[in-house]
Protein backbone atom coordinates (compact mmCIF):
# COMPACT_ATOMS: atom_id res chain seq x y z
CA UNK A 1 0.00 0.00 0.00
CA UNK A 2 1.38 3.42 -0.96
CA UNK A 3 0.87 5.93 1.81
CA UNK A 4 0.29 9.65 1.15
CA UNK A 5 3.91 10.43 2.08
CA UNK A 6 5.13 8.12 -0.70
CA UNK A 7 6.22 5.19 1.46
CA UNK A 8 5.18 1.68 0.45
CA UNK A 9 4.40 -0.65 3.35
CA UNK A 10 2.72 -4.05 3.72
CA UNK A 11 -1.04 -3.68 3.92
CA UNK A 12 -1.14 -5.02 7.47
CA UNK A 13 1.47 -2.49 8.60
CA UNK A 14 -0.55 0.38 7.14
CA UNK A 15 -3.28 -0.13 9.69
CA UNK A 16 -1.43 -1.38 12.73
CA UNK A 17 -1.72 0.70 15.90
CA UNK A 18 0.10 -1.82 18.09
CA UNK A 19 1.39 -5.40 17.71
CA UNK A 20 -1.81 -6.94 19.07
CA UNK A 21 -4.15 -4.84 16.99
CA UNK A 22 -4.75 -7.00 13.94
CA UNK A 23 -5.88 -10.09 15.90
CA UNK A 24 -8.07 -7.85 18.04
CA UNK A 25 -9.58 -6.31 14.92
CA UNK A 26 -10.45 -9.71 13.54
CA UNK A 27 -12.18 -10.62 16.78
CA UNK A 28 -14.08 -7.33 16.69
CA UNK A 29 -15.27 -8.03 13.16
CA UNK A 30 -16.47 -11.48 14.17
CA UNK A 31 -18.23 -10.26 17.29
CA UNK A 32 -21.96 -9.93 17.20
CA UNK A 33 -24.26 -7.06 18.09
CA UNK A 34 -26.16 -8.89 20.81
CA UNK A 35 -27.88 -11.84 19.16
CA UNK A 36 -28.53 -10.04 15.89
CA UNK A 37 -25.67 -9.82 13.41
CA UNK A 38 -21.90 -9.39 13.17
CA UNK A 39 -20.72 -5.89 13.88
CA UNK A 40 -19.79 -5.16 10.29
CA UNK A 41 -23.18 -6.31 9.02
CA UNK A 42 -24.93 -4.13 11.60
CA UNK A 43 -23.08 -1.06 10.34
CA UNK A 44 -23.85 -1.90 6.73
CA UNK A 45 -27.50 -2.16 7.69
CA UNK A 46 -27.50 1.58 8.33
CA UNK A 47 -26.88 2.24 4.63
CA UNK A 48 -29.47 2.05 1.85
CA UNK A 49 -29.50 -1.48 0.49
CA UNK A 50 -28.30 -0.50 -2.99
CA UNK A 51 -25.08 0.93 -1.57
CA UNK A 52 -24.14 -1.94 0.70
CA UNK A 53 -22.15 -4.16 -1.72
CA UNK A 54 -19.81 -1.39 -2.85
CA UNK A 55 -19.49 0.04 0.66
CA UNK A 56 -18.71 -3.23 2.40
CA UNK A 57 -14.93 -3.43 1.89
CA UNK A 58 -14.35 0.17 2.92
CA UNK A 59 -16.62 0.01 5.95
CA UNK A 60 -15.14 -3.24 7.16
CA UNK A 61 -11.69 -1.72 6.87
CA UNK A 62 -12.82 1.25 8.89
CA UNK A 63 -14.32 -0.97 11.55
CA UNK A 64 -11.45 -3.43 11.69
CA UNK A 65 -8.60 -0.99 11.83
CA UNK A 66 -9.97 1.86 13.87
CA UNK A 67 -12.87 2.28 16.25
CA UNK A 68 -16.63 2.26 15.89
CA UNK A 69 -16.90 6.05 15.85
CA UNK A 70 -14.71 6.27 12.72
CA UNK A 71 -16.93 3.69 11.06
CA UNK A 72 -19.98 5.78 11.90
CA UNK A 73 -18.33 8.82 10.31
CA UNK A 74 -17.49 6.81 7.22
CA UNK A 75 -21.07 5.56 6.96
CA UNK A 76 -22.38 9.12 7.23
CA UNK A 77 -20.06 10.35 4.49
CA UNK A 78 -20.87 7.42 2.21
CA UNK A 79 -24.58 7.97 2.63
CA UNK A 80 -24.21 11.70 2.01
CA UNK A 81 -22.37 11.59 -1.33
CA UNK A 82 -22.54 7.94 -2.42
CA UNK A 83 -19.73 5.41 -2.26
CA UNK A 84 -18.32 5.92 -5.78
CA UNK A 85 -18.03 9.68 -5.31
CA UNK A 86 -16.58 9.24 -1.84
CA UNK A 87 -13.90 6.82 -3.03
CA UNK A 88 -13.14 9.06 -6.00
CA UNK A 89 -12.54 11.96 -3.63
CA UNK A 90 -10.28 9.84 -1.47
CA UNK A 91 -8.34 8.52 -4.47
CA UNK A 92 -7.69 12.11 -5.50
CA UNK A 93 -6.38 12.82 -2.02
CA UNK A 94 -4.33 9.66 -1.60
CA UNK A 95 -3.17 8.95 -5.13
CA UNK A 96 -4.48 5.44 -5.67
CA UNK A 97 -7.48 3.26 -4.94
CA UNK A 98 -5.92 1.05 -2.30
CA UNK A 99 -4.85 4.11 -0.37
CA UNK A 100 -8.42 5.35 -0.46
CA UNK A 101 -9.27 2.50 1.85
CA UNK A 102 -6.47 3.54 4.16
CA UNK A 103 -7.82 7.06 4.30
CA UNK A 104 -11.39 5.90 4.71
CA UNK A 105 -10.22 4.06 7.81
CA UNK A 106 -9.03 7.29 9.41
CA UNK A 107 -10.60 10.32 11.02
CA UNK A 108 -9.64 12.20 7.86
CA UNK A 109 -12.40 10.51 5.87
CA UNK A 110 -15.48 12.58 6.65
CA UNK A 111 -13.73 15.95 6.40
CA UNK A 112 -11.94 15.13 3.15
CA UNK A 113 -15.03 13.73 1.47
CA UNK A 114 -17.04 16.80 2.35
CA UNK A 115 -14.25 19.14 1.26
CA UNK A 116 -13.80 17.52 -2.15
CA UNK A 117 -17.46 16.91 -2.95
CA UNK A 118 -18.99 20.07 -1.55
CA UNK A 119 -21.22 18.15 0.85
CA UNK A 120 -22.52 20.25 3.76
CA UNK A 121 -20.87 20.05 7.15
CA UNK A 122 -21.96 18.24 9.21
CA UNK A 123 -23.19 15.57 6.84
CA UNK A 124 -26.72 14.33 7.56
CA UNK A 125 -26.83 10.97 9.25
CA UNK A 126 -28.06 8.16 6.96
CA UNK A 127 -31.73 7.31 7.21
CA UNK A 128 -33.00 3.76 7.08
CA UNK A 129 -35.77 4.10 4.53
CA UNK A 130 -37.38 0.81 5.49
CA UNK A 131 -38.14 2.03 9.01
CA UNK A 132 -41.41 3.82 9.81
CA UNK A 133 -41.01 7.50 10.58
CA UNK A 134 -41.83 9.25 13.83
CA UNK A 135 -45.15 11.15 13.75
CA UNK A 136 -45.06 14.68 12.28
CA UNK A 137 -44.22 17.26 14.92
CA UNK A 138 -42.77 14.65 17.29
CA UNK A 139 -40.53 16.29 19.89
CA UNK A 140 -37.21 14.67 19.10
CA UNK A 141 -35.66 15.30 22.49
CA UNK A 142 -32.51 14.46 24.41
CA UNK A 143 -31.72 15.14 28.08
CA UNK A 144 -28.64 17.18 28.96
CA UNK A 145 -27.45 17.36 32.55
CA UNK A 146 -25.70 20.46 33.88
CA UNK A 147 -23.28 18.43 35.99
CA UNK A 148 -20.28 19.94 34.22
CA UNK A 149 -21.26 23.50 35.13
CA UNK A 150 -19.78 25.00 31.97
CA UNK A 151 -21.68 26.85 29.28
CA UNK A 152 -19.08 25.98 26.63
CA UNK A 153 -19.77 22.28 27.24
CA UNK A 154 -23.44 22.99 26.62
CA UNK A 155 -22.75 24.88 23.41
CA UNK A 156 -20.74 22.01 21.96
CA UNK A 157 -23.34 19.46 23.03
CA UNK A 158 -26.24 21.44 21.58
CA UNK A 159 -24.53 21.82 18.20
CA UNK A 160 -23.89 18.12 18.03
CA UNK A 161 -27.43 17.24 19.10
CA UNK A 162 -28.78 19.46 16.34
CA UNK A 163 -26.53 17.71 13.81
CA UNK A 164 -28.05 14.38 14.87
CA UNK A 165 -31.54 15.68 14.14
CA UNK A 166 -32.76 16.49 17.66
CA UNK A 167 -35.36 19.26 17.84
CA UNK A 168 -35.62 19.58 21.65
CA UNK A 169 -33.25 19.42 24.60
CA UNK A 170 -34.29 18.99 28.22
CA UNK A 171 -31.81 20.97 30.33
CA UNK A 172 -31.54 19.34 33.75
CA UNK A 173 -30.24 21.57 36.48
CA UNK A 174 -28.45 19.87 39.34
CA UNK A 175 -29.41 20.91 42.86
CA UNK A 176 -28.95 19.19 46.22
CA UNK A 177 -31.86 18.33 48.51
CA UNK A 178 -31.02 19.37 52.04
CA UNK A 179 -30.46 16.81 54.74
CA UNK A 180 -32.97 17.92 57.36
CA UNK A 181 -36.34 19.63 57.69
CA UNK A 182 -35.12 23.01 58.91
CA UNK A 183 -35.94 25.70 56.37
CA UNK A 184 -34.87 25.93 53.66
CA UNK A 185 -35.29 22.25 52.86
CA UNK A 186 -33.90 22.96 49.39
CA UNK A 187 -30.71 24.82 48.62
CA UNK A 188 -31.21 28.30 47.21
CA UNK A 189 -30.90 27.95 43.45
CA UNK A 190 -29.13 31.28 42.92
CA UNK A 191 -26.10 29.85 44.74
CA UNK A 192 -25.64 27.04 42.26
CA UNK A 193 -24.22 27.01 38.75
CA UNK A 194 -27.37 25.22 37.58
CA UNK A 195 -29.25 28.46 38.13
CA UNK A 196 -26.52 30.93 37.23
CA UNK A 197 -25.84 29.40 33.81
CA UNK A 198 -29.42 28.61 32.85
CA UNK A 199 -30.12 31.71 30.77
CA UNK A 200 -26.91 31.37 28.75
CA UNK A 201 -27.56 27.69 28.13
CA UNK A 202 -31.12 28.28 26.92
CA UNK A 203 -29.85 30.90 24.50
CA UNK A 204 -27.09 28.57 23.27
CA UNK A 205 -29.59 25.80 22.63
CA UNK A 206 -31.82 28.19 20.69
CA UNK A 207 -28.81 29.34 18.66
CA UNK A 208 -28.21 25.70 17.71
CA UNK A 209 -31.81 25.40 16.50
CA UNK A 210 -33.14 23.46 19.50
CA UNK A 211 -36.20 24.17 21.62
CA UNK A 212 -35.75 23.88 25.37
CA UNK A 213 -37.54 22.31 28.32
CA UNK A 214 -36.11 23.42 31.67
CA UNK A 215 -36.23 20.65 34.24
CA UNK A 216 -35.01 21.29 37.81
CA UNK A 217 -33.29 18.12 38.98
CA UNK A 218 -32.92 17.50 42.72
CA UNK A 219 -30.32 15.28 44.36
CA UNK A 220 -29.75 14.43 48.01
CA UNK A 221 -27.23 16.25 50.19
CA UNK A 222 -25.58 15.01 53.37
CA UNK A 223 -25.92 11.32 52.54
CA UNK A 224 -23.77 9.32 50.15
CA UNK A 225 -25.02 5.73 49.76
CA UNK A 226 -22.62 2.85 49.38
CA UNK A 227 -22.63 0.75 46.21
CA UNK A 228 -24.71 -1.88 48.01
CA UNK A 229 -27.19 0.76 49.20
CA UNK A 230 -27.44 2.15 45.67
CA UNK A 231 -28.21 -1.35 44.45
CA UNK A 232 -31.05 -1.67 46.98
CA UNK A 233 -32.45 1.81 46.24
CA UNK A 234 -32.60 1.05 42.51
CA UNK A 235 -33.64 -2.56 42.91
CA UNK A 236 -37.00 -4.28 42.98
CA UNK A 237 -36.95 -5.57 46.59
CA UNK A 238 -39.37 -3.13 48.23
CA UNK A 239 -38.95 -4.64 51.71
CA UNK A 240 -35.17 -4.23 51.59
CA UNK A 241 -35.57 -0.69 50.31
CA UNK A 242 -37.98 0.29 53.11
CA UNK A 243 -35.68 -1.21 55.73
CA UNK A 244 -32.69 0.66 54.34
CA UNK A 245 -34.55 4.00 54.23
CA UNK A 246 -35.77 3.54 57.80
CA UNK A 247 -32.25 2.74 59.00
CA UNK A 248 -30.64 5.72 57.29
CA UNK A 249 -33.34 8.10 58.50
CA UNK A 250 -32.93 6.81 62.04
CA UNK A 251 -29.19 7.55 61.84
CA UNK A 252 -29.67 11.01 60.31
CA UNK A 253 -32.83 12.11 62.12
CA UNK A 254 -34.39 12.85 58.75
CA UNK A 255 -38.12 13.21 58.21
CA UNK A 256 -38.15 13.17 54.41
CA UNK A 257 -37.60 9.86 52.69
CA UNK A 258 -34.46 9.63 50.61
CA UNK A 259 -36.05 8.65 47.33
CA UNK A 260 -37.87 11.47 45.60
CA UNK A 261 -40.90 9.33 44.81
CA UNK A 262 -41.07 8.05 48.42
CA UNK A 263 -41.17 11.39 50.26
CA UNK A 264 -43.17 11.39 53.50
CA UNK A 265 -43.42 13.95 56.32
CA UNK A 266 -43.93 13.43 60.04
CA UNK A 267 -46.87 15.82 60.45
CA UNK A 268 -48.94 18.56 58.82
CA UNK A 269 -46.53 21.30 59.88
CA UNK A 270 -43.68 19.51 58.12
CA UNK A 271 -45.76 19.19 54.97
CA UNK A 272 -46.46 22.94 54.96
CA UNK A 273 -42.78 23.62 55.50
CA UNK A 274 -41.88 21.26 52.67
CA UNK A 275 -44.15 23.01 50.14
CA UNK A 276 -43.03 26.49 51.20
CA UNK A 277 -39.44 25.43 50.73
CA UNK A 278 -40.04 23.72 47.39
CA UNK A 279 -41.94 26.75 46.08
CA UNK A 280 -39.08 29.05 47.05
CA UNK A 281 -36.78 26.69 45.15
CA UNK A 282 -38.75 26.16 41.94
CA UNK A 283 -40.25 29.64 41.32
CA UNK A 284 -36.86 31.30 40.66
CA UNK A 285 -36.22 28.64 38.02
CA UNK A 286 -39.60 29.33 36.43
CA UNK A 287 -38.86 33.07 36.34
CA UNK A 288 -35.40 32.52 34.88
CA UNK A 289 -36.76 30.09 32.28
CA UNK A 290 -39.34 32.69 31.24
CA UNK A 291 -36.73 35.45 31.03
CA UNK A 292 -34.43 33.26 28.93
CA UNK A 293 -37.22 32.34 26.52
CA UNK A 294 -37.40 28.63 27.36
CA UNK A 295 -40.14 26.78 25.50
CA UNK A 296 -41.41 24.50 28.28
CA UNK A 297 -41.02 23.95 32.02
CA UNK A 298 -41.18 20.82 34.17
CA UNK A 299 -42.66 21.63 37.59
CA UNK A 300 -41.19 18.59 39.37
CA UNK A 301 -39.54 15.25 38.90
CA UNK A 302 -40.27 11.87 40.49
CA UNK A 303 -41.79 13.14 43.75
CA UNK A 304 -44.96 11.15 43.16
CA UNK A 305 -45.78 10.37 46.78
CA UNK A 306 -46.16 14.09 47.45
CA UNK A 307 -48.40 14.54 44.39
CA UNK A 308 -50.65 11.64 45.40
CA UNK A 309 -50.92 12.67 49.06
CA UNK A 310 -51.03 16.45 48.60
CA UNK A 311 -52.76 17.07 45.27
CA UNK A 312 -54.37 20.33 46.42
CA UNK A 313 -50.98 21.72 47.43
CA UNK A 314 -49.51 20.78 44.06
CA UNK A 315 -52.42 22.40 42.19
CA UNK A 316 -51.82 25.62 44.10
CA UNK A 317 -48.09 25.39 43.34
CA UNK A 318 -48.76 24.85 39.62
CA UNK A 319 -50.91 27.99 39.62
CA UNK A 320 -48.04 29.97 41.12
CA UNK A 321 -45.61 28.55 38.55
CA UNK A 322 -47.96 29.52 35.70
CA UNK A 323 -47.88 33.09 36.96
CA UNK A 324 -44.09 33.06 36.46
CA UNK A 325 -43.70 30.89 33.35
CA UNK A 326 -46.15 31.39 30.51
CA UNK A 327 -45.35 28.37 28.35
CA UNK A 328 -46.58 24.75 28.60
CA UNK A 329 -45.99 22.78 31.79
CA UNK A 330 -45.58 19.14 32.68
CA UNK A 331 -44.58 17.02 35.67
CA UNK A 332 -42.26 14.01 35.32
CA UNK A 333 -43.86 11.05 37.12
CA UNK A 334 -41.94 7.86 37.75
CA UNK A 335 -42.76 4.82 35.60
CA UNK A 336 -43.99 2.71 38.52
CA UNK A 337 -46.20 5.30 40.29
CA UNK A 338 -47.60 7.58 37.57
CA UNK A 339 -51.02 5.91 37.60
CA UNK A 340 -51.78 7.27 41.08
CA UNK A 341 -51.52 10.89 39.91
CA UNK A 342 -54.74 12.74 39.12
CA UNK A 343 -53.77 16.37 38.46
CA UNK A 344 -52.92 16.06 34.77
CA UNK A 345 -55.79 18.40 33.90
CA UNK A 346 -53.83 21.19 35.62
CA UNK A 347 -50.89 20.59 33.26
CA UNK A 348 -50.44 20.58 29.49
CA UNK A 349 -48.85 17.13 29.14
CA UNK A 350 -48.80 13.83 30.98
CA UNK A 351 -45.10 13.39 31.70
CA UNK A 352 -43.49 10.05 32.56
CA UNK A 353 -39.94 8.98 33.35
CA UNK A 354 -40.34 5.90 31.18
CA UNK A 355 -37.88 3.39 32.62
CA UNK A 356 -40.34 0.54 32.18
CA UNK A 357 -38.99 -3.02 32.45
CA UNK A 358 -39.29 -4.49 28.96
CA UNK A 359 -37.95 -8.05 29.23
CA UNK A 360 -36.55 -10.34 31.93
CA UNK A 361 -34.46 -12.26 29.41
CA UNK A 362 -30.76 -11.57 28.97
CA UNK A 363 -30.03 -9.99 25.60
CA UNK A 364 -33.69 -9.82 24.49
CA UNK A 365 -34.55 -9.64 20.82
CA UNK A 366 -35.98 -6.57 19.14
CA UNK A 367 -39.41 -8.22 19.01
CA UNK A 368 -39.34 -8.97 22.75
CA UNK A 369 -38.40 -5.39 23.56
CA UNK A 370 -41.19 -4.04 21.35
CA UNK A 371 -43.65 -6.35 23.09
CA UNK A 372 -42.48 -4.91 26.41
CA UNK A 373 -43.29 -1.43 25.17
CA UNK A 374 -46.73 -2.58 24.04
CA UNK A 375 -47.48 -3.70 27.60
CA UNK A 376 -46.07 -0.57 29.20
CA UNK A 377 -47.76 1.97 26.94
CA UNK A 378 -51.30 0.56 26.86
CA UNK A 379 -52.29 2.13 30.24
CA UNK A 380 -50.73 5.43 29.18
CA UNK A 381 -52.86 5.53 26.04
CA UNK A 382 -56.00 5.06 28.14
CA UNK A 383 -54.87 7.81 30.54
CA UNK A 384 -54.23 10.15 27.62
CA UNK A 385 -57.81 9.65 26.43
CA UNK A 386 -59.28 9.96 29.93
CA UNK A 387 -57.47 13.17 30.83
CA UNK A 388 -57.50 14.70 27.36
CA UNK A 389 -53.75 15.28 27.43
CA UNK A 390 -50.94 14.10 25.14
CA UNK A 391 -48.06 12.14 26.65
CA UNK A 392 -44.40 13.07 26.84
CA UNK A 393 -41.70 10.61 27.82
CA UNK A 394 -39.91 13.21 29.91
CA UNK A 395 -37.10 10.70 30.38
CA UNK A 396 -36.37 7.44 28.60
CA UNK A 397 -33.12 5.60 28.32
CA UNK A 398 -31.10 2.47 28.93
CA UNK A 399 -27.72 1.72 30.47
CA UNK A 400 -25.11 -0.03 28.34
CA UNK A 401 -25.27 -3.30 30.30
CA UNK A 402 -26.64 -6.83 29.74
CA UNK A 403 -29.71 -6.14 31.97
CA UNK A 404 -30.72 -2.93 30.19
CA UNK A 405 -34.08 -4.36 29.15
CA UNK A 406 -34.89 -5.71 32.61
CA UNK A 407 -34.08 -2.65 34.75
CA UNK A 408 -33.53 0.39 32.50
CA UNK A 409 -33.19 2.74 35.48
CA UNK A 410 -30.26 0.88 37.04
CA UNK A 411 -26.58 1.37 36.28
CA UNK A 412 -24.02 -1.24 37.29
CA UNK A 413 -20.27 -1.48 37.00
CA UNK A 414 -20.23 -4.52 34.78
CA UNK A 415 -18.97 -5.34 31.31
CA UNK A 416 -20.61 -2.92 28.88
CA UNK A 417 -23.08 -4.02 26.21
CA UNK A 418 -23.47 -1.00 23.95
CA UNK A 419 -25.24 -3.06 21.29
CA UNK A 420 -28.08 -4.04 23.61
CA UNK A 421 -28.45 -0.36 24.50
CA UNK A 422 -28.74 0.43 20.78
CA UNK A 423 -31.30 -2.35 20.29
CA UNK A 424 -33.37 -0.96 23.19
CA UNK A 425 -33.32 2.45 21.50
CA UNK A 426 -34.43 0.91 18.22
CA UNK A 427 -37.33 -0.88 19.91
CA UNK A 428 -38.34 2.32 21.72
CA UNK A 429 -38.36 4.43 18.58
CA UNK A 430 -40.34 1.81 16.68
CA UNK A 431 -42.91 1.77 19.47
CA UNK A 432 -43.14 5.57 19.45
CA UNK A 433 -43.55 5.69 15.67
CA UNK A 434 -46.87 3.82 16.00
CA UNK A 435 -48.36 6.03 18.74
CA UNK A 436 -49.28 9.56 17.64
CA UNK A 437 -50.74 10.33 21.09
CA UNK A 438 -47.15 10.41 22.39
CA UNK A 439 -45.87 13.84 21.37
CA UNK A 440 -42.23 13.40 22.17
CA UNK A 441 -39.43 11.79 24.14
CA UNK A 442 -36.33 13.08 25.90
CA UNK A 443 -33.66 10.38 25.95
CA UNK A 444 -31.35 10.12 28.93
CA UNK A 445 -28.50 10.98 28.62
CA UNK A 446 -26.23 13.13 26.49
CA UNK A 447 -23.09 13.25 28.60
CA UNK A 448 -19.48 12.67 27.66
CA UNK A 449 -17.89 9.73 29.46
CA UNK A 450 -14.31 8.68 29.94
CA UNK A 451 -13.08 7.00 26.75
CA UNK A 452 -13.50 4.57 25.25
CA UNK A 453 -17.29 4.86 25.02
CA UNK A 454 -17.42 1.26 23.80
CA UNK A 455 -16.57 0.14 27.35
CA UNK A 456 -18.76 2.59 29.29
CA UNK A 457 -21.75 0.90 31.03
CA UNK A 458 -23.69 4.08 31.87
CA UNK A 459 -26.83 5.59 30.30
CA UNK A 460 -24.74 8.06 28.30
CA UNK A 461 -24.99 7.65 24.52
CA UNK A 462 -22.23 9.96 23.26
CA UNK A 463 -20.10 8.08 20.69
CA UNK A 464 -22.06 4.85 21.23
CA UNK A 465 -24.15 2.91 18.69
CA UNK A 466 -27.31 4.16 20.44
CA UNK A 467 -26.51 7.70 19.31
CA UNK A 468 -26.31 6.48 15.73
CA UNK A 469 -29.63 4.66 16.12
CA UNK A 470 -31.18 7.82 17.51
CA UNK A 471 -29.78 9.88 14.66
CA UNK A 472 -31.20 7.49 12.05
CA UNK A 473 -34.67 8.21 13.43
CA UNK A 474 -34.19 11.86 14.31
CA UNK A 475 -32.31 12.94 11.19
CA UNK A 476 -33.74 13.97 7.80
CA UNK A 477 -35.80 11.24 6.18
List each language-model region with its residue ranges.
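Conserved hydrophobic register position within alpha-solenoid helical repeats
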Residues: 1, 10-11, 40-43, 74, ...
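Substrate-binding cleft and catalytic face of glycoside hydrolase catalytic domains
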Residues: 164-183, 197-307, 401-403, 444-449
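Amphipathic alpha-helical scaffolding segments comprising HEAT/armadillo-like alpha-solenoid repeats
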Residues: 15-29, 49-64, 83-95, 118-125
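Boundary/entry segment of secreted carbohydrate-active catalytic domains
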Residues: 124-161
